């Protein structure tokens, strides 16, 4: 029997609050039905990078000079490798995302740096998928969120070129690829941990906290090109 399918288009609306940035769609994740999960998407090198994340974390902390230790202590569980808790899923919506950079940069930067809050968005897509976009600032990670263990999710994506241009997916430009983990570290508190690429041990750690309810953007419909 022939069935008629009615498709309703729902317009995406954002809150009028000035602090809430626009929501944009990132490029689709590669689809590989034979090998579901993030392992089917990322390179062997990046799989190895995540496998060695505890060692990278330990090396970055050990390299922090004594005079900077108070900055590590001040961040509490955010910089504690074993602080991940169960049920890591991030509810869709707007988040404040604050970057703490852990590691000695090539340009002589301090080994612990904390940056101001910016805005990120976790978006609900088709087939129970989630996407992540950093919407403001200069460093603009974005990608797809994959289930992993009971204490972490995996983000696979790329460093986007500009605010609002989220066209790069993982693998499009390997030099811009990124992988990381999302963990819950407390009530209404998550972190996104991105290990550095290259020889220097270091981490970009984003503290994610939900934007207050009255400042949340109305959730747009799922992107039709989701995998």
Each language-model region and where it sits:
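Sec-dependent signal peptide recognition
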Residues: 2-8
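C-terminal motif of bacterial Sec signal peptides marking the signal peptidase cleavage site
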Residues: 14-16
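Amphipathic/hydrophobic helical signal segments and adjacent flexible N-terminal regions
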Residues: 18-90, 226-227
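Primarily secretory-pathway and cell-envelope proteins
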Residues: 26-43, 122, 128-140, 217-227
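Edge beta-strand at a domain terminus
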Residues: 73-77, 170-227
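Mid-length scaffold segments of soluble, non-membrane domains
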Residues: 87-154
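An anionic, turn-rich surface loop/hairpin at beta-sheet edges
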Residues: 105-116, 155-181
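Short, solvent-exposed aromatic-acidic interface loops
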Residues: 134-141, 158-163, 194-201
């Amino acid at each position: 029997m022939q069935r008629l399918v009615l498709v309703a288009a729902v317009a995406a609306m954002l809150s009028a609050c000035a602090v809430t940035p626009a929501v944009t769609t990132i490029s689709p994740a590669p689809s590989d039905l034979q090998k579901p999960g993030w392992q089917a998407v990322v390179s062997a090198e990046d799989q190895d990078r995540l496998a060695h994340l505890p060692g990278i974390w330990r090396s970055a902390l050990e390299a922090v000079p004594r005079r900077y230790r108070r900055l590590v202590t001040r961040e509490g569980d955010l910089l504690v490798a074993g602080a991940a808790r169960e049920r890591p899923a991030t509810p869709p919506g707007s988040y404040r995302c604050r970057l703490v950079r852990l590691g000695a940069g090539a340009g002589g930067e301090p080994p612990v740096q904390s940056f101001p809050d910016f805005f990120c968005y976790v978006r609900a897509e088709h087939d129970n998928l989630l996407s992540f976009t950093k919407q403001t600032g200069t460093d603009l990670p974005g990608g797809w969120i994959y289930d992993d263990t009971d204490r972490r999710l995996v983000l696979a994506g790329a460093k986007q070129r500009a605010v609002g241009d989220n066209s790069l997916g993982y693998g499009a430009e390997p030099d811009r690829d990124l992988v990381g983990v999302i963990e819950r570290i407390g009530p209404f508190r998550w972190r996104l941990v991105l290990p550095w690429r290259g020889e220097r041990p270091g981490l970009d750690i984003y503290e994610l906290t939900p934007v207050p309810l009255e400042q949340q953007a109305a959730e747009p419909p799922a992107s039709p090109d989701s995998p």
